[in-house]
Amino acid sequence: MVNLGSIWQNLLASQAPLQSMTGNATTMAGLATYSLPQLPYAYNALEPYISAQIMELHHSKHHQTYVTNLNNALKVHVAAIASSDIPAQIAQQPAIKFNGGGHINHSLFWKNLAPAETPETNYSKAAPSLAAEIEKTWGSFDEFKKAFSAALLGIQGSGWGWLVKESTAEKGRLRIITTKDQDPVVGGEVPVFGVDMWEHAYYLQYLNGKAAYVENIWKVINWKTAEERFQGSREDAFADLKALL
């Protein structure tokens, strides 16, 4: 099987079916399925910065489509494993990668947003440890915001921008990265928070005004969640996904 990286191996492993052996045949049953997470706020809670219309379409339509397509692809993939059909297994991997990434990214994204002017969106009070590390790395929050915003606006086509924490060689070090399409954060990095730069995240409200969307997204970043992810492990950051099975 093609190596899709640890996140995809974990995704497939989490779907490991019950197996019963009859001679040389493997029977697979009990396939788990993923479900759409509930938002921790109402669709209109992020207004005026993200409209209720965008939030409802983004969550109930776009994210739901990723979940549906992921479950369908995993079902076909498991059947291909059961029949030892390697070409069919390989054929499903792009769909698993794309839709699995869409489910992972959006599940993280919803949790790192919160209504403006709430305790969760107060940068210095909600995220003291993260704020100290940001200012150590970039010199000030303003310089960090400038660098992160530039990375978001530099994405060509569709993708995501992420603040990540290294959890390997340089444990605790912060970096800004971008991922293309629905590729998630892979390897040993912890996603502290992410921003969706697909057009469906902003176009109905901002049209082609990506810069205005990027400026306003800062008003609804959930720094409490970001602080928890910064202080936690990669497993902690992805724990919510396991609960969606």
UniProtKB/Swiss-Prot annotation:
It is found in: Mitochondrion matrix. Its main location: mitochondrion. Its EC number is 1.15.1.1. The keyword DNA repair does not apply. Keywords: Antioxidant, Manganese, Metal-binding, Mitochondrion, Oxidoreductase, Transit peptide. Gene3D superfamilies: Fe,Mn superoxide dismutase (SOD) domain, Iron/manganese superoxide dismutase, C-terminal domain. It is an enzyme of class 1 (oxidoreductase). This is Superoxide dismutase [Mn], mitochondrial. The lineage of its organism: Eukaryota, Fungi, Dikarya, Ascomycota, Pezizomycotina. The gene is sod-2.
